[in-house]
């Protein structure tokens, strides 16, 4: 099976130093079996490489489980087609409203007010009775993820997040995919190393340009929704917009695409648990985002 070539050098250097795949697989299967709840696992499936491996491990371990995909409406079309074709048995969960509706009626998501994950991914599954959630989260992905426990209880949701491949490195993931001859989205072969929402406040620089060039329709729709939302009244009731002197929709789009990173340097990735305007920022500046 042909695997993406752009990271092979890195994977080979990792393989010389790290735990063999077989041991990682055995440990992950034991983890799933040890913590299996009587009613079974809720498996979060995104169609990316990590969730592909995680779902396969659930199948191999023969634990009771159901797989669910949060259909955000802003995932890459290539990814959505892949899920439909290769995983027709995965249950789709849809948000109450579209991403564009939430923007035009409330506000675009920001690094410090990232409502999109909750509204598009988490809320649709809240009423699901399966409270043990298996996720393909790996510590290697970011320092923020590495700092959190492998078994994590989310009190306000009454859910337990289980991370069977938490200690896996990227080469483990691709080696497993190769050994089991698993299909994966073609975007990986085109140079994309992580797949997620086409529109995201954490995209900047080269990655943002890649997304804009690859999926221009999404960005035209996004800008249309922002224009429907922005108005002089929005500016007048927003201390945040006043603070950054954002008076026009063009200035806002410039800020959204490029200046958020400078304005909120302490918010570095979308894995972070957001505490809006911590460290001296005035939380009241985000009141305009609270009524979503």
Model-flagged regions — what are they?
Residues 1-180:
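ATP-dependent adenylation/nucleotidyltransferase module used to activate substrates
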Residues 179, 185-292:
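ATP/NTP-dependent adenylation/nucleotidyl-transfer catalytic domains that generate, transfer
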């Amino acid at each position: 099976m042909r695997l993406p070539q752009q990271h092979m050098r890195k994977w080979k250097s990792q393989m010389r130093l790290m735990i063999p795949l077989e041991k990682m697989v055995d440990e992950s299967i034991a983890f799933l079996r040890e913590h299996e709840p009587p009613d079974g696992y809720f498996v979060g499936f995104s169609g990316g490489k990590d969730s592909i491996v995680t779902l396969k491990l659930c199948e191999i371990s023969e634990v009771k489980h159901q797989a669910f995909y949060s259909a955000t409406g802003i995932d890459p079309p290539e990814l959505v087609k892949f899920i439909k074709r290769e995983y027709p048995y995965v249950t789709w969960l849809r948000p109450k409203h579209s991403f564009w509706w939430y923007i035009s009626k409330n506000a675009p998501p920001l690094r410090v007010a990232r409502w999109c994950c909750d509204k598009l991914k988490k809320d649709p599954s809240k009423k699901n009775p399966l409270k043990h959630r298996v996720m393909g989260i790996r510590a290697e992905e970011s320092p923020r993820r590495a700092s959190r426990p492998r078994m994590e209880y989310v009190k306000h949701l009454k859910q337990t997040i289980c991370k069977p491949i938490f200690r896996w490195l990227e080469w483990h993931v691709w080696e497993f995919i190769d050994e089991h001859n698993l299909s994966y989205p073609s975007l990986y072969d085109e140079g994309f190393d992580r797949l997620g929402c086409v529109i995201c406040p954490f995209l900047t620089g080269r990655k943002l340009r890649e997304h804009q060039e690859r999926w221009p329709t999404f960005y035209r729709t996004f800008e249309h929704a922002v224009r429907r939302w922005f108005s002089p009244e929005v500016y007048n009731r927003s201390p945040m917009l006043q603070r950054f002197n954002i008076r026009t929709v063009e200035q806002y789009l410039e800020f959204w695409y490029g200046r958020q990173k400078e304005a909120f340097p302490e918010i570095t990735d979308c894995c972070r648990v957001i505490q809006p305007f911590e460290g001296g920022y005035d939380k009241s500046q985000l009141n305009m985002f609270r009524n979503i």
